Amino acid sequence: MKTETPSVKIVAITADEAGQRIDNFLRTQLKGVPKSMIYRILRKGEVRVNKKRIKPEYKLEAGDEVRIPPVRVAEREEEAVSPHLQKVAALADVILYEDDHILVLNKPSGTAVHGGSGLSFGVIEGLRALRPEARFLELVHRLDRDTSGVLLVAKKRSALRSLHEQLREKGMQKDYLALVRGQWQSYVKSVQAPLLKNILQSGERIVRVSQEGKPSETRFKVEERYAFATLVRCSPVTGRTHQIRVHTQYAGHPIAFDDRYGDREFDRQLTEAGTGLNRLFLHAAALKFTHPGTGEVMRIEAPMDEGLKRCLQKLRNAR
C-alpha cells in the first residue's frame, strides 16, 4: 500500500472551465479519488471557492479561486493506472487525430471507455495517465466495451459543449460496420422501433423494442454479401443504448458474437467456417462532425482490426 498526501492547491478557473459544477471539476482535479470522498470534503467545507463554503451543485465562474485541500488516497500500487502499463502505452498507437481541442482514437474491442463496475482500466483513465499534463479530457460519446472504432474525446470544456450540441442537434454522423446473420434485404434501408432500457438486479443493461420506449431510428446499407451473412453499414439517427444491436436483432439479422442480443447458431457457423472471430462484430468505422475550434467539417475513419479483416476474407473465400 502507498499513501499520497498532496498539498493544498489553489486553482484559478479559466473561461473554458467555467459553467461546470464544482463536484465534476473536482473529479478532474482529484483523479483516482472516490466520489464519496469528494462529496465528504465538500460537505465538511474543506473545499472553498473565493474563501467561501459551497454546495456540490455550485457552478464555477471564470475568475473563481478554488481551494482544494490535501486528500490522502491509500491505494494498492498494482491497481494504480500507470503510464508504464502496457494497455496505456498501447493507447498511444491507436490515436487517429489530435490537436488542442480534440483527440480521436480507434478504441480496441474489449476495452471499456470508463473504468468502474469491476473494471480497473478504461480508455479515459488510460488517456489521463498518458497525458498527465492535460487539464481536461472528457468523452464526447460512448462505445460499448466490445465495440471497436472511432471514439471522440474533448480536451477543452468549450469543445465538449460544442460537440454535445452537435449530438443533440443531430449534426454528428456516425457510421458503423456490422456483420449480421443471413441475407439483409436491400430494400430495408431503415429500422424505426422505439427502445426501452431495463436495468437488471445485476446492474446489467438490457434494451428491448417496446411501444413504451423512446423513438429510435437506424439507417442501413448493404456493403458486402457472403454465403450466410451480410456486412452492413449502420448509421444511427438517434443515439440510444445498444441501438444498432437491438435494431438488427429486431430486423431478424442479429450481429455476430453478440452475447446479449445474438444467435449462437450463427456464431457456431462462423466458427466452423474458420473465421477465427471471437468478439462482437460491430465497428465504429467513421465519424463526421464540425471541428469545435476551426468550424471545419471533419470525417475521421478508423480501420478494422486484423481479426475482423481476416474474418471477412475467410467469408469471401468461402463464397
From Swiss-Prot:
Give EC number(s), comma-separated: 5.4.99.24
Q: Name the InterPro entries for this protein.
A: PsdUridine_synth_cat_dom_sf, PsdUridine_synth_RluA-like_CS, PsdUridine_synth_RluC/D, PsdUridine_synth_RsuA/RluA, RluA_PseudoU_synthase, S4_RNA-bd, S4_RNA-bd_sf
**Residues annotated as the enzyme's active site:** 144
Keyword field = Isomerase, RNA-binding, rRNA processing
* Annotated catalysed reactions: uridine(955/2504/2580) in 23S rRNA = pseudouridine(955/2504/2580) in 23S rRNA
Which GO biological process categories is it annotated with? enzyme-directed rRNA pseudouridine synthesis
Top EC class for this record: isomerase
Q: Where are the transmembrane segments?
A: none
* Domain spans labelled S4 RNA-binding: 20-83
Q: Coiled-coil stretches, from where to where?
A: none
Which superkingdom, per the lineage? Answer: Bacteria
Provide the GO MF annotations for this entry.
23S rRNA pseudouridine(955/2504/2580) synthase activity; RNA binding
Identify its protein family: Belongs to the pseudouridine synthase RluA family.
Q: What does this protein do?
A: Responsible for synthesis of pseudouridine from uracil at positions 955, 2504 and 2580 in 23S ribosomal RNA.
- The name this protein carries in UniProt is Ribosomal large subunit pseudouridine synthase C
Q: Which source organism?
A: Escherichia coli O6:H1 (strain CFT073 / ATCC 700928 / UPEC)
